[in-house]
């Protein structure tokens, strides 16, 4: 049997979990650092798809709102080609047909807007061969492109960093889709072994948080890669508030389920109730009812419910739980705003990844396993899991900061989400890498997505 520490070491040895800095004293060293991280990220993403057991797993839709996994396997490679050509860094496409098929996903859909289009998907082997060609092309560009430090967002190198961070995003979203496939379609992969400890959840409590001025927004000369929505300036004076010491655990959420929370429209707003009735949800998405008790679905296994792990729900479920919990406690409970989350993060004194040295202070970046872990495993100041474990929904729909500018190479990354339909998630998760784990990161999804 392989020792768990060996597994963790193998994961960390294979992958740089923190984002690349844009500055440095030696351009050639930076070139080789980028080459290494590109290949690590590209290979890690491919290894995630080793979970797929058979040819049917590649083309079966995990959920109706998303493409099958064969699309996402090709999509991240096609992204490099499309963006590099758009920026004028390559003249000839590698495979125009595949680059058309894999160009755009279906992530911006309402929960009842089902994609019924029939696609003639290529074979996994054909996509693997295509990915090999893309890997060679990007590696060649890394060798040939002139490099001046620091890298700025109008540098050709920004496109390569964009491709790396884009693949990090899809590593996470593809892993979620795999959790929604039938178990018969997937098998375990050692590099993605889950956390193996569970127990009774601690009693949650509200802790006082002092008010104060919170400032958000990156400067253009920031030394970490950022998506366009991170730049600009925002500040807000917060009044004192209280916040939960721990993330909501499966055990804490169970009371809502057992009290009929999924059957009582009183706890749901109009959007949430529409989703509840359409989806016919009766419990969190990865909970599996069993005659011997609840079980939890992971990527390639089910396990007895780890009650002290955080519950994984969408924003509509989280808001409904808060309304229900308010009546149980007499407190006015709700999701935090983006400003409040950032204020908590600031007060925790948690540094971004540059200050971590060899110790990762959270369940993030596959550093502790490929699953959530107990909600009391990683103290961060007075609170736990302000970073890592699972993403934290906020009540804030994403919006542009004053000074926001669209990045011309990826003009549809953020702007389509400025529709009041996409709420921000903060903090990253156990599988978040690179930019996703930074406190300035601003990722937003429709409120019914997991």
Positions of the model-derived regions?
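Intrinsically disordered, low-complexity peptide-like regions
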Residues: 1-4, 361
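Functional-site microenvironments in short loops/helix caps that host divalent-cation chemistry
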Residues: 163, 167, 177-226, 246, ...
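Disulfide-stabilized, aromatic/cysteine-rich ligand-recognition loop
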Residues: 3-66, 74-79, 86-147, 153-182, ...
């Amino acid at each position: 049997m392989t020792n768990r520490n060996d597994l963790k070491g193998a994961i960390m040895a294979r992958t740089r979990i923190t984002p690349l800095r844009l500055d440095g004293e030696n351009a050639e060293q930076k070139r080789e650092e980028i080459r290494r991280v590109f290949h690590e990220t590209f290979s890690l993403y491919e290894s995630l798809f080793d979970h797929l057991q058979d040819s049917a797993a590649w083309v079966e839709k995990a959920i109706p709102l998303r493409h099958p996994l064969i699309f996402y396997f090709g999509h991240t490679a096609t992204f490099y080609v499309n963006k590099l050509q758009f920026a004028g860094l390559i003249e000839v496409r590698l495979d125009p047909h595949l680059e058309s098929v894999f160009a755009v996903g279906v992530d911006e859909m309402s929960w009842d807007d089902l994609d019924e289009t029939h696609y003639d998907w290529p074979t996994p082997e054909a996509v693997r061969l295509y990915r090999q060609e893309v890997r060679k092309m990007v590696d060649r560009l890394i060798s040939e492109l002139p490099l001046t430090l620091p890298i700025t967002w109008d540098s050709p190198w920004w496109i390569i960093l964009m491709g790396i961070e884009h693949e990090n995003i899809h590593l996470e979203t593809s892993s979620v889709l795999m959790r929604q496939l039938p178990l018969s379609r997937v098998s375990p992969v050692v590099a993605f072994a889950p956390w193996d400890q569970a127990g009774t959840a601690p009693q949650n409590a509200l802790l006082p948080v002092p008010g104060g001025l919170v400032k958000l927004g990156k400067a253009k000369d920031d030394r970490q890669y950022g998506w366009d929505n991170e730049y600009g300036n925002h500040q807000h004076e917060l009044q004192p508030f209280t916040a939960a010491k721990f993330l909501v655990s499966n055990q804490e959420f169970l009371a809502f389920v057992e009290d009929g929370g999924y059957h009582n429209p009183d706890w749901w707003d109009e959007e949430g109730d529409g989703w509840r009735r359409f989806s016919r949800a009766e419990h969190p998405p990865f909970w599996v009812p069993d005659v011997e008790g609840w079980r939890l679905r992971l990527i390639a296994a089910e396990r007895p419910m780890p009650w002290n792990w955080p519950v994984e729900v969408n924003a509509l479920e989280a808001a409904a739980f808060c309304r229900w919990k308010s009546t149980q406690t007499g407190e006015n409970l709700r999701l935090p705003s983006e400003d409040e989350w950032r204020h908590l993060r600031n007060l925790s004194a948690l540094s971004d990844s540059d200050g971590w040295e060899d110790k990762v202070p959270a369940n993030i970046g596959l550093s502790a396993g490929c699953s959530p872990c107990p909600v009391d495993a990683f103290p961060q100041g007075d609170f736990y899991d302000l970073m890592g474990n699972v993403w934290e929904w906020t009540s804030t729909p994403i919006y542009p900061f004053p000074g926001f500018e669209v990045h011309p190479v990826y003009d549809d990354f953020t702007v389509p989400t400025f529709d009041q339909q996409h709420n921000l998630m903060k903090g990253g998760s156990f599988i978040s890498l690179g930019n996703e784990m930074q406190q300035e990161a601003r990722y937003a999804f429709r409120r019914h997505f997991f």
